[in-house]
């Protein structure tokens, strides 16, 4: 028997955090800990730049992204740092199959996600500002000016919709600890 998804996205986990907070590392570690029969899925992000080795995303050209957006292929989409990001509508099918689904979202677009999935659980990955600066510098993707902008943005508050459940997971220690916490949250969604 396949459970039907609550239309409100009750098994959706909206992961967010500053650039460099370690979201991609946590998702990679979480995937490695999943049991073969465990219905927890991590959605791919579609992005208009090369995702590199550290990010699990599918690269699209601006034109391809625009075509997919026009066809309604994205459940969620947003622009940030001059790039386009999207989460495919396949997550709706996964939710309807009874899976807990984790998406790598954006703090600035939590309201959009909550509007479509009002029962989602938002999870913010937090990290010490000094450690965040070191991580951003170490990955070599941003200029010094871009790093400064991202550090400033990391400390800015973001709007959290009323009645949106927001959890915070610290990624200051070993990332395996934070990944285990995130996996516990996903497993809790399956049990609810």
Curated annotation (Swiss-Prot):
<dbReference type="Pfam" id="PF13238">
    <property type="entry name" value="AAA_18"/>
</dbReference>
<dbReference type="InterPro" id="IPR027417">
    <property type="entry name" value="P-loop_NTPase"/>
</dbReference>
<keyword id="KW-0547">Nucleotide-binding</keyword>
<dbReference type="InterPro" id="IPR008145">
    <property type="entry name" value="GK/Ca_channel_bsu"/>
</dbReference>
<dbReference type="GO" id="GO:0005524">
    <property type="term" value="F:ATP binding"/>
</dbReference>
<comment type="function">
    <text>Catalyzes the phosphorylation of ribose 1,5-bisphosphate to 5-phospho-D-ribosyl alpha-1-diphosphate (PRPP).</text>
</comment>
<comment type="pathway">
    <text>Metabolic intermediate biosynthesis; 5-phospho-alpha-D-ribose 1-diphosphate biosynthesis; 5-phospho-alpha-D-ribose 1-diphosphate from D-ribose 5-phosphate (route II): step 3/3.</text>
</comment>
<protein>
    <recommendedName>
        <fullName>Ribose 1,5-bisphosphate phosphokinase PhnN</fullName>
        <ecNumber>2.7.4.23</ecNumber>
    </recommendedName>
</protein>
<dbReference type="GO" id="GO:0033863">
    <property type="term" value="F:ribose 1,5-bisphosphate phosphokinase activity"/>
</dbReference>
<dbReference type="GO" id="GO:0006015">
    <property type="term" value="P:5-phosphoribose 1-diphosphate biosynthetic process"/>
</dbReference>
<keyword id="KW-0808">Transferase</keyword>
<dbReference type="InterPro" id="IPR012699">
    <property type="entry name" value="PhnN"/>
</dbReference>
<comment type="similarity">
    <text>Belongs to the ribose 1,5-bisphosphokinase family.</text>
</comment>
<dbReference type="GO" id="GO:0019634">
    <property type="term" value="P:organic phosphonate metabolic process"/>
</dbReference>
<keyword id="KW-0067">ATP-binding</keyword>
């Amino acid at each position: 028997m396949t459970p039907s998804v609550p239309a409100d996205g009750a098994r959706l986990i909206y992961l967010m955090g500053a650039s460099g907070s370690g979201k991609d590392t946590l998702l990679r570690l979480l995937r490695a800990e999943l049991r073969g029969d465990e219905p927890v899925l991590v959605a791919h992000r579609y992005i208009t730049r090369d995702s590199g080795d550290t990010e699990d995303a599918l690269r699209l050209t601006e034109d391809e992204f625009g075509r997919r957006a026009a066809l309604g292929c994205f459940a969620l989409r947003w622009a940030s740092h001059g790039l386009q990001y999207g989460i495919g509508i396949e997550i709706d099918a996964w939710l309807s199959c009874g899976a807990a689904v984790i998406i790598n979202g954006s703090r600035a677009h939590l309201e959009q996600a909550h509007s479509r999935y009002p029962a989602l659980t938002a999870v913010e990955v937090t990290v010490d500002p000094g450690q965040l600066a070191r991580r951003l510098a170490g990955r070599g993707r941003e200029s010094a000016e871009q790093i400064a902008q991202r550090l400033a943005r990391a400390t800015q508050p973001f709007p959290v919709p009323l009645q949106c459940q927001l959890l915070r997971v610290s990624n200051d220690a070993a990332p395996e600890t934070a990944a285990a916490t995130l996996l516990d949250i996903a497993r809790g969604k399956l049990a609810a």
